Every structure is written in structure tokens, then in C-alpha cells.
């Protein structure tokens, strides 16, 4: 059972309570703190669209602490981040691995950050399928196309040559925050909020 903290605010009309995620949303903060799957993707996409409708000119802040997950769910978030008008600033806290790292890198250029003790991991897409040989072949071809697409996007977002990306994602590739900055996955390592 997951417990969600409640925040109580004083207003001129009295007290109002929010779950913590709703309160963060009021400040244009979205928190992705679990595996990327269809449910979490739907929630993140809905929040992105809501915040765009609220104010299309104000940045949105996506905090990421995720081990990764579904490629199709992650691509729904990625495409929405690129589609909406506001810049989406991404901030890694803890770990951004696999699709989590991909979404971290998908933030607006100049607005992709990690806290100093964060870890970022990139690798090639994982897939598993069983069944008839013909169906296995179909799925193998699909995952190779997805791998090419993800590599191409990572190359574009990091500035790394495609051949470097292909080599570097062959196995789990863990980076500390400063290494991720040098690689181009993020733009800066931050230690405190700007005052």
C-alpha cells in the first residue's frame, strides 16, 4: 500500500488539503517516481496537457527518479513533451535509467539537469517474445527498428555521433551526473534552486 502525503494550506477561505502531487502540480511540477508503464505515462501526459492548457508560456518541471520501463509508454511521454508549447525542464533525482534517462534527455535544451548524486543509465531496448518462429522474427525486426529510432534521437539530443551512441548503448552504461553532463544527456548538475 502506497501512502500519499497530504498538504494543508491556509487560504482566505479557510484550510484546503491537497495530496502532495496535486500541490506540486499547482507549481507546474510533475513527479515521475516509478517505472514507466501505460498507467504512469497516461498520468504524466494528462498532467503535461493540463499544464499547457493552464499556461502555454510557463515552463513545466518534470522530476525523474525512474528505473525505466515500457518503450511505447515512454514514447507517449516523449512525443507529448515535444508536442506541447511550454518548455519541459527535466531534473534527475536519484536514478534515471533506460526510458527514464531517455525522458531526462528529452527535456528542453539548456533545461536538463541532475542533482549531484544522481545516476543515469542508458542501454539498448530490451524485448522478449515467445511463439512461432515467424512471429519471433516480426518482433525481432520491430525491436531493431525501435533501437535505431532511439539511438537516432539520443544522438540528436546529446550531440554525440550516432556510431558513438550505438557503441555506448550495447550494454548498461552507468554515468554519474558530471559524466552525463559531459556526454550531453543533461545540461548541468545543480546543487540548489536558483534564488
From Swiss-Prot:
Active site: 98, 123
Known EC number: 3.4.21.92
GO cellular component, one term: endopeptidase Clp complex
PROSITE patterns recorded: CLP_PROTEASE_HIS, CLP_PROTEASE_SER
Gene Ontology BP annotations: protein quality control for misfolded or incompletely synthesized proteins
Presence of keyword Protease: yes
InterPro entries reported in the protein's UniProt record: ClpP, ClpP/crotonase-like_dom_sf, ClpP/TepA, ClpP_His_AS, ClpP_Ser_AS
Entry's localization field: Cytoplasm
Catalytic activity: Hydrolysis of proteins to small peptides in the presence of ATP and magnesium. alpha-casein is the usual test substrate. In the absence of ATP, only oligopeptides shorter than five residues are hydrolyzed (such as succinyl-Leu-Tyr-|-NHMec, and Leu-Tyr-Leu-|-Tyr-Trp, in which cleavage of the -Tyr-|-Leu- and -Tyr-|-Trp bonds also occurs)
Keywords: Cytoplasm, Hydrolase, Protease, Serine protease
Keyword Translocase: no
Domain of life: Bacteria
One Pfam family recorded for the sequence: CLP_protease
GO molecular function, one term: ATPase binding
Function, as annotated: Cleaves peptides in various proteins in a process that requires ATP hydrolysis. Has a chymotrypsin-like activity. Plays a major role in the degradation of misfolded proteins.
Record's subunit section: Fourteen ClpP subunits assemble into 2 heptameric rings which stack back to back to give a disk-like structure with a central cavity, resembling the structure of eukaryotic proteasomes.
Family: Belongs to the peptidase S14 family.
HAMAP family tied to this protein: ClpP
NCBIfam families named in the record: clpP, PRK00277.1, PRK12553.1
Protein name: ATP-dependent Clp protease proteolytic subunit
Amino acid at each position: 500500500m502506497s501512502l500519499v502525503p497530504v498538504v494543508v494550506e491556509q487560504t482566505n477561505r479557510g484550510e484546503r488539503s491537497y495530496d502532495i502531487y496535486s500541490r506540486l502540480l499547482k507549481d507546474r511540477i510533475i513527479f515521475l517516481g516509478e517505472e514507466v508503464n501505460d498507467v504512469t505515462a497516461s498520468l504524466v501526459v494528462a498532467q503535461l496537457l493540463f499544464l499547457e492548457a493552464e499556461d502555454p508560456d510557463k515552463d513545466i518541471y518534470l522530476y525523474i527518479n525512474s528505473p525505466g520501463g515500457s518503450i511505447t509508454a515512454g514514447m507517449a511521454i516523449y512525443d507529448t513533451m515535444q508536442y506541447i508549447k511550454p518548455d519541459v525542464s527535466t531534473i534527475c533525482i536519484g536514478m534515471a535509467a533506460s526510458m527514464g534517462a531517455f525522458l531526462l534527455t528529452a527535456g528542453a535544451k539548456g533545461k536538463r539537469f541532475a542533482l549531484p548524486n544522481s545516476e543515469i543509465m542508458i542501454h539498448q531496448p530490451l524485448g522478449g517474445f515467445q511463439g512461432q518462429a515467424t512471429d519471433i522474427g516480426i518482433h525481432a525486426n520491430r525491436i531493431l527498428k525501435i533501437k535505431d529510432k532511439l539511438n537516432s534521437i539520443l544522438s540528436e539530443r546529446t550531440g554525440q555521433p550516432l556510431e558513438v551512441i550505438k557503441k555506448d548503448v550495447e550494454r548498461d552504461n552507468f554515468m554519474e551526473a558530471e559524466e552525463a553532463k559531459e556526454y550531453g544527456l543533461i545540461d548541468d548538475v545543480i546543487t540548489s534552486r536558483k534564488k
